[in-house]
């Protein structure tokens, strides 16, 4: 919202910062491999149970140790030093009849987690201008931003993986619970056949990521944070534009009359945004102890793209005028809003060459797509009138059309009206104004429309899911309408009646309101 000053030469300002984000270990003092091996050995000795595979007792030292001297510091593997920076350049100035302000901003943050993020980058540009003449004043404001974000998939993707793996834990829990005797990643454990458990001794998945399931302490399990953060990847790019423009016209002054009591204003609002999401979910084989989460033949790769866009345009013309004790405000407006969604998802199962993670490498491939459009067009007119702040009247009418409703009846008209009377403004007001300083009686009636349903619900949809018919003993697959639809979907209307009294006593120290209202709804969706 910053603007330049008139008669100001070009002024350039810069501010910025650079910083680092660090996740301290703090109170999380976990055991190293030697300490953990000794702990496991003593626990097994005390409970008279055999040592897990890989742990041995050194008869000379009397201490337990792990066979390959692995000593993984999971905090060091999972967390890294993040970097953030922000830079802003501002240019402003103005002449005798105009001002301008231009702001350029850059923000970048590299996250503290290894793997898919989160990382965030944003560019923003803002331009504000104003220009005034003797009769007209113009103002414009434009904002454009572009952002790019890498992070793990959304919760639904996590739940999907959890359904296959059984135990997908959050990052911190996995960092605390993973054994120091398991490597974060070991490419030598790659397995290209179905003998996953035999080849990696249950400690790694088929592609080298360490996994953990503990039978000694009961059913305790943890997910390798690097595994999870690389399984679920999402990139989101957003482009957004917002623009406003306005013109204030001094009508009487334009025609030579020296009056400030009549103003005409036009305002336009524009906005557009587009979001592109790219998803990647890879589910490799994982056999852990007696748990078989996924066999090699069921490894799954899912790739998806999602494009969302929305656009808005609003035009508003306002007249505001005063003649004596009469004050009139008239508004005429139009708005159009459109939303578009385009989803495309493909997945493949059974990968013979898993290091080539493309869908065409799968033995079986599947895909689905979905797109929809929602649009609403509105016209509005409103008039507010008051006489001496004593008699008040407001009347509004809207006409809205929605793409969600049946084509022939998708338009609806919604009127509203309200009246008010300031009894305390009358000469015959019987109460002491120092005691009752405001006494208002009001009544109103209004209608609102609701079209909050799904898209294309007024259209029958053909489905091929298990649609078969027997022709002379031969089962034939076909398509059929699978659901019933309402071909007469129209606006749901909510009607409101209201009567009220407002009182203010003792110079507004005490206020009182009494109301009666009635709400009814028609043509429920």
For each of these PLM feature ranges, what is it?
Residues 22-55, 145-214, 439-468, 509:
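A surface-exposed, glycine/aromatic-enriched loop/edge motif typical of exported proteins
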Residues 27-31, 283-285, 346-349:
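Short Gly/aromatic-enriched secondary-structure transition segments
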Residues 26, 60-63, 70, 165-166, ...:
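Intrinsic-disorder/low-complexity loop/linker signature
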Residues 75-152, 170, 178-182, 240-241, ...:
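Transmembrane beta-barrel wall of Gram-negative outer-membrane proteins
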Residues 85, 128-137, 141-146, 196-281, ...:
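Extracellular/periplasmic, surface-exposed regions of secreted and cell-surface proteins
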Residues 4-116, 184, 191, 195-214, ...:
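Residues embedded in well-ordered regular secondary structure
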């Amino acid at each position: 919202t910053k603007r330049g000053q008139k008669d100001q030469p070009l002024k350039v300002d810069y501010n910025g910062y650079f910083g680092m984000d660090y996740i301290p270990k703090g109170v999380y003092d976990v055991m190293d491999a030697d300490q953990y091996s000794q702990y496991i050995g003593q626990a097994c000795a005390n409970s008279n149970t055999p040592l897990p595979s890989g742990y041995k007792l050194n008869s000379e030292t009397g201490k337990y140790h792990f066979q390959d001297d692995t000593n993984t510091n999971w905090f060091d593997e999972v967390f890294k030093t993040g970097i953030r920076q922000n830079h802003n350049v501002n240019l402003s100035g103005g002449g005798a009849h105009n001002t301008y302000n231009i702001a350029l901003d850059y923000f970048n943050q590299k996250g503290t987690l290894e793997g898919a993020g989160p990382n965030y980058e944003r560019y923003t540009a803002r331009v504000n201008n104003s220009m005034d003449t003797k009769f007209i004043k113009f103002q414009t404001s434009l904002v454009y931003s572009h952002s790019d974000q890498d992070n793990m998939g959304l919760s639904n993707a996590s739940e999907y993986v959890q359904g296959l793996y059984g135990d997908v834990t959050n990052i911190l829990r996995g960092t605390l619970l993973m054994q120091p005797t398991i490597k974060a990643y070991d490419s030598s454990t790659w397995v290209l056949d179905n003998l996953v458990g035999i080849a990696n001794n249950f400690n790694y998945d088929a592609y080298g990521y360490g996994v953990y399931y503990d039978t000694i302490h009961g059913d305790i399990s943890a997910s390798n944070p690097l595994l999870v953060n690389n399984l679920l990847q999402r990139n989101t790019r957003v482009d957004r534009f917002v623009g406003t423009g306005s013109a204030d016209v001094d009508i009487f002054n334009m025609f030579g009359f020296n009056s400030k009591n009549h103003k005409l204003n036009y305002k336009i609002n524009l906005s557009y945004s587009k979001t592109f999401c790219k998803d990647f979910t890879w589910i490799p084989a994982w056999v852990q102890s007696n748990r078989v989460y996924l066999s090699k033949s069921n490894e799954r790769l899912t790739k998806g793209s999602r494009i969302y866009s929305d656009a808005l345009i609003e035009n508003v013309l306002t007249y505001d005028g005063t003649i004596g004790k009469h004050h009139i405000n008239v508004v005429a407006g139009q708005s159009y809003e459109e939303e578009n969604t385009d989803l495309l998802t493909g997945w493949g199962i059974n990968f013979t060459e898993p290091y080539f993670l493309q869908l065409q490498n799968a033995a079986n491939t599947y895909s689905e797509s979905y797109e929809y459009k929602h649009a609403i067009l509105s016209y509005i007119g409103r008039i507010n009138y008051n006489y001496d702040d004593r008699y008040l009247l407001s009347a509004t009418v809207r006409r809205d059309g929605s793409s969600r409703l049946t084509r022939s009846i998708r338009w609806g008209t919604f009127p509203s009206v309200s009246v008010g009377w300031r009894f305390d403004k009358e000469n015959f007001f019987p109460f002491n104004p120092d005691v009752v300083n405001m006494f208002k009686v009001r009544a109103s009636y209004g209608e609102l429309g609701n079209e909050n349903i799904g898209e294309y619900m007024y259209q029958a949809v053909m489905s091929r899911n298990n649609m078969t018919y027997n022709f002379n003993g031969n089962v034939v697959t076909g398509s059929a309408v699978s659901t019933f639809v309402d071909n007469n979907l129209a606006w749901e209307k909510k009607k409101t009646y209201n009567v009220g009294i407002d009182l203010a006593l003792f110079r507004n120290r005490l206020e009182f309101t009494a109301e009666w209202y009635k709400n009814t709804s028609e043509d429920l969706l």
